[in-house]
């Protein structure tokens, strides 16, 4: 029996010896569970692309390679652990031909834990939650620690955004508030973690995000861009680094989301005041980032009663989702079920929020979005227009984000994870109750050009004792019509038809002006002609099958 020279000691060929040593180490460490060869080769190649900073290949490996291998090999089990991967790719000390793999291992673990979160039906264990957060801490430590020169690392935009997004989202707060998700053994561990604040905690999260802003000088650079200046003039080597610029940029949106989840809507908008709703923005390169940005900015405006501004932002986002629907469906199929369909879920939420905004402040929107809105929520909008507070509650709960209470820890008893949502919902409904008659009030005002306040009060069955509060509600409607204090995010000089009604009160008389914008009939026909031409063009491209003579 002749033995292959490769199956034994050294051959004298450095490349074959290195391959043998790597394979030998991998098999020794994975005696209980052999890593498939495809996975081992994928990891080795992935690390090499990280070392070479080949962003195009990294993007392909991240977006397609990892989900594909997950679908093939890891439906019922987890990816190899850290030690196994180190032995596959080489740890630096054991295999001298490979550079130190610390950064790659951290990045691999980021994918590993994301897979853990999607695969475990009852949620990850406390140990996994702890290790996942510590891994993010290590990653940002590598980014923020250098003082003289930036970290030598390049990653695709979508991965950088996912890192920030997952870091902000970490559902540890929901886990802490729900004793039903914990085993009895995890009680003591959670107590220790909370005392040391060594898992997801709002203060270090905010500290890291603001540190990324400072390190990248992103606010100064965005301000320079808006003013037409060269951003490099206000940035140092870190700010000019693509890695730091993008992390800082996405951290702004991460902070926006964090402040919204905490219920601080003014600070949320203040955080992104230098980010414009611009089709050339960096967030446009990552669809889920674009949708997240629009959703949270629009939601903040809605909670601050800027319903007209919120409507415009929601409609723009829905139009984007509508235009890219086929592309997103294709991407989601390629990713299998590894990554959550953020865009699909947000699309549904946007319609519920848009229904609230248009009920409180009607305005003309895109025809295609309006038809979809009435199809989905038409009956609900009718109920809300008639003052049904329960429909407002349901629409809010179906459209709002998962609010956080970072300090809440429940060691035993009922699930308290929904308490933050209920607090925000109740605060929102208090505002709505003060405006609940506004849609009805608007209906009466549209029937007149002048109307005494007493007569309007009698129409709405307002008693003399409640007359003063009724006048207050009238002034509230006036404020909504004018959108006092509105801060427009896009700062674009466009035709802004926010409402079709305006009025003022002169002593005891209401003077109403119908400001309805005339429908652009010519524009409508032009759009329909373009659609007809497109249909004709497609029909002409179809092959013509000759009729078969009988």
Swiss-Prot record:
PCI domain ranges (all copies): 309-503
Keywords: Cytoplasm, Initiation factor, Protein biosynthesis
Transmembrane segments: none
GO molecular function: translation initiation factor activity
Pfam families, sorted: Paf67
Subcellular location, record wording: Cytoplasm
Principal location class: cytoplasm
Highest taxon of the lineage: Eukaryota
Gene Ontology cellular-component annotations: eukaryotic 43S preinitiation complex; eukaryotic 48S preinitiation complex; eukaryotic translation initiation factor 3 complex
Any one GO biological process: formation of cytoplasmic translation initiation complex
Claim: Calcium is one of the keywords in the record: no
Stored InterPro entries: eIF3l, PCI_dom
Stretches for region Disordered: 1-20
Quaternary structure (record): Component of the eukaryotic translation initiation factor 3 (eIF-3) complex.
Function: Component of the eukaryotic translation initiation factor 3 (eIF-3) complex, which is involved in protein synthesis of a specialized repertoire of mRNAs and, together with other initiation factors, stimulates binding of mRNA and methionyl-tRNAi to the 40S ribosome. The eIF-3 complex specifically targets and initiates translation of a subset of mRNAs involved in cell proliferation.
Family designation: Belongs to the eIF-3 subunit L family.
Protein name stated in the entry: Eukaryotic translation initiation factor 3 subunit L
